[in-house]
């Protein structure tokens, strides 16, 4: 079987790493395309995969995003035509499902946040199968032309599948002088925005300023873009550490005492690894985060002073591990639809 996967954001190599390994182990041919955005290309390489780079992020303007969308669609179509793919898979890449449909290739897309309206209008309608967590109410997806049998759902978090074989590597901390007596906090900024932009959610910068001045804390910030990296460094906060490049974020999370993130994936990785986690997300919560909050595995943050900055005892005893082969089977069902 010939399979095409498309990665457009940093989380996608993580999600697909075990799926690609499973397919390659049974002698399937897997080819990957990727958008040059954030740490996507670095993470592909770090996880032992190779990809053809097509396109880059269009920036914050609608015009820039539109130009890059059409440019990337054209590039993907030229690349994929004639390669004889049996199925195409993606995590939220509407470029893949649109291109696959035009080329007559069955496709499946998966995602775990249902309020990205334009992305899902494009991606879901073009896909053969749509695979989402069962914590997302089915009725929320009807607006995207998605319902059973096109819609398939899986239990738990996607992170519980791709982290099923994960064990943390303590060496991730070796590059910094970490005082084990201080509370180790990992922070992830909001996606695709300037932290200092006047329309940005002020809560994350406020949290960063608060933690960055506490002598009892090590605050490791994992920026999404070089712009964010430069801005955080310019603040010169004494307790803040900013890695120079992409790091083993999962190990960092597992070894931390606390995670504060404005983005969904790192929040859910922390929940899957049994680490206390706060969200500063200012948008509409999706079904996955709503369920995690009900379970007490995710806490909304409205004031940085409310953070419980304590050393964590234990490890990852609360972890849930799920079989990635089950997620892969749902995605590959597009081939037989």
Model-predicted segments: where are they?
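A donor-sugar binding/catalytic signature common to diverse glycosyltransferases
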Residues: 88-99, 109-110, 252-289
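Leloir-type glycosyltransferase catalytic cores
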Residues: 147-178, 295-337
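A nucleotide-sugar donor-handling region in carbohydrate enzymes
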Residues: 131-200
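Catalytic donor nucleotide-activated moiety binding site of glycosyltransferases and closely related
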Residues: 47-60, 208-243
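N-terminal subdomain of nucleotide-sugar transferases
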Residues: 1-33
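Donor nucleotide-activated moiety binding/catalytic core segment of transferases
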Residues: 72-79, 226-266
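A conserved, positively charged/aromatic
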Residues: 108-110, 120-132, 253
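Conserved nucleotide-sugar phosphate-binding/catalytic loop shared by glycosyltransferases and other
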Residues: 24-69
């Amino acid at each position: 079987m010939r399979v095409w996967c498309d990665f457009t954001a940093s989380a996608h190599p993580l999600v697909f790493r075990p799926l690609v390994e499973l397919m390659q182990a049974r002698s399937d041919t897997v080819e990957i395309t990727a958008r040059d955005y954030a740490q996507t290309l670095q993470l592909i390489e770090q996880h032992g995969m190779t990809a053809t780079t097509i396109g880059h992020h269009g920036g914050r303007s609608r015009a820039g995003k539109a130009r890059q969308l059409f440019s990337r669609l054209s590039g993907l179509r030229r690349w994929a035509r004639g390669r004889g793919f049996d199925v195409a898979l993606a995590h939220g890449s509407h470029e893949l499902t649109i291109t696959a449909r035009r080329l007559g290739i069955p496709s499946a897309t998966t995602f775990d946040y249902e309020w990205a309206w334009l992305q899902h209008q494009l991606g879901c309608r073009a896909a053969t199968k749509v695979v989402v967590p069962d914590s997302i109410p089915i009725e929320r997806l009807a607006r995207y032309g998605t319902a059973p049998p096109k819609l398939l759902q899986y239990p738990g978090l996607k992170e519980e599948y791709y982290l099923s074989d994960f064990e943390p590597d303590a060496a991730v901390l070796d590059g910094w002088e970490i005082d084990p007596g201080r509370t180790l906090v990992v922070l992830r900024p909001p996606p695709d925005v300037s932290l200092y932009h006047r329309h940005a959610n002020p809560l994350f910068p406020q949290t960063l300023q608060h933690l960055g001045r506490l002598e009892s804390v090590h605050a490791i910030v994992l920026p999404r873009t070089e712009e964010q990296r430069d801005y955080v460094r310019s603040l010169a906060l004494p307790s803040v550490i900013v890695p120079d490049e992409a790091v083993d974020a999962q190990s960092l999370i597992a070894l931390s005492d606390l995670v504060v993130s404005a983005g969904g994936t790192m929040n859910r990785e922390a929940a899957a690894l049994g680490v206390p986690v706060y969200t500063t997300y200012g948008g509409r919560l999706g079904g996955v985060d709503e369920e995690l909050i009900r379970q007490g595995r995710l806490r909304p943050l409205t004031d940085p002073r409310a953070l419980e900055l304590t050393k964590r005892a234990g490890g990852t005893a609360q972890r849930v591990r799920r079989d990635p082969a089950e997620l892969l089977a749902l995605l590959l069902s597009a081939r037989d639809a």
